[in-house]
UniProtKB/Swiss-Prot annotation:
The keyword Hydrolase applies. This is Pimeloyl-[acyl-carrier protein] methyl ester esterase. It comes from Salmonella typhimurium (strain LT2 / SGSC1412 / ATCC 700720). GO terms for molecular function: pimelyl-[acyl-carrier protein] methyl ester esterase activity. It catalyses: 6-carboxyhexanoyl-[ACP] methyl ester + H2O = 6-carboxyhexanoyl-[ACP] + methanol + H(+).
Length: 256
């Protein structure tokens, strides 16, 4: 089995694992790497099948998490953005002793809309899966454009995301399909009631993929967690609002 691409950066006394979202790779953290690197030792990861971690097929959430855990430090803050938030959450469930704190960014324990639960309509996720086989490149670009809609810097932020995708090898259709399948089917709402490490949830007020309506629902479901909504951010707050994003992580670190 191949190894995944993993880079360590920075010299802070606290380890921080950064997990990207669907279709992307670790270059997405480029805009905050310098700032965070002076406070943390960063672990930049390309998830299995993405970017430089080629040679992997589609995986379940559990398989993906197990693969990432092999390379991970004994103790770290785990931060996951979007799909990466599910991987970080699964790590907190399976290896709680190794997760100093859990941070999810523009992520949902259940991305798919269910009865009484806001989310992405399953037929939209299914449509993306269908379109992937028809026009792979265009489907990924559409998904990226959705992530920045509504922000003051939407066009520029979408260009940033596109350049991240193009900077590394594109994932196979099978891998992208597997990622959409995770987004469509996984539901960790009940399971995450049981995590007891510090748990920070960051959201963008304008996010079109993870509706802000889930925030009060999860505040009630997970009273041990803390939530913060960034007023003018959409699905990629670390790109549109890097200073506020980094500040939230420094505040978390100082509380540990």
């Amino acid at each position: 089995m191949n190894d995944i691409w993993w880079q360590t950066y920075g010299e802070g006394n606290c380890h921080l694992v950064l997990l990207h979202g669907w279709g992307l790779n670790a270059e997405v953290w480029h805009c905050i790497r310098e700032e965070l690197g002076s406070h943390f030792t960063l672990h930049l990861v390309d998830l299995p099948g993405y970017g430089r971690s080629s040679g992997f097929g589609a995986m379940t959430l559990e398989e993906m998490t197990a693969q990432v855990a092999k390379n991970a430090p004994d103790q770290a803050i785990w931060l996951g953005w979007s799909l990466g938030g599910l991987v970080a959450s699964q790590m907190a469930l399976t290896h709680p002793e190794r997760v100093q704190a859990l941070v999810t960014v523009a992520s949902s324990p259940c991305f798919s809309a269910r009865e009484g639960w806001p989310g992405i309509k399953p037929e939209i996720l299914g449509g993306f899966q269908q379109q992937l086989s028809d026009d792979f490149q265009r489907t990924v670009e559409r998904f990226l454009a959705l992530q920045t809609l509504g922000t003051e810097t939407a066009r520029q932020d979408a260009r940033t995301l596109k350049s991240v995708v193009l900077a590394q090898p594109m994932p196979d259709v099978e891998v992208l399909n597997g990622g959409l399948e995770i987004l469509k089917t996984v539901d960790l709402r009940e399971a995450l009631k049981n995590v007891n490490m510090p748990f920070l949830r960051l959201y963008g007020y304008l996010d079109g993929l993870v509706p802000r309506k889930i925030v009060p629902l999860l505040d009630t479901l997970w009273p041990h967690s803390t939530s913060q909504i960034m007023a003018k951010a959409a699905h990629a707050p670390f790109i549109s609002h890097p200073a506020a994003f980094c500040q939230a992580l420094m505040t978390l670190k100082s509380s540990l």
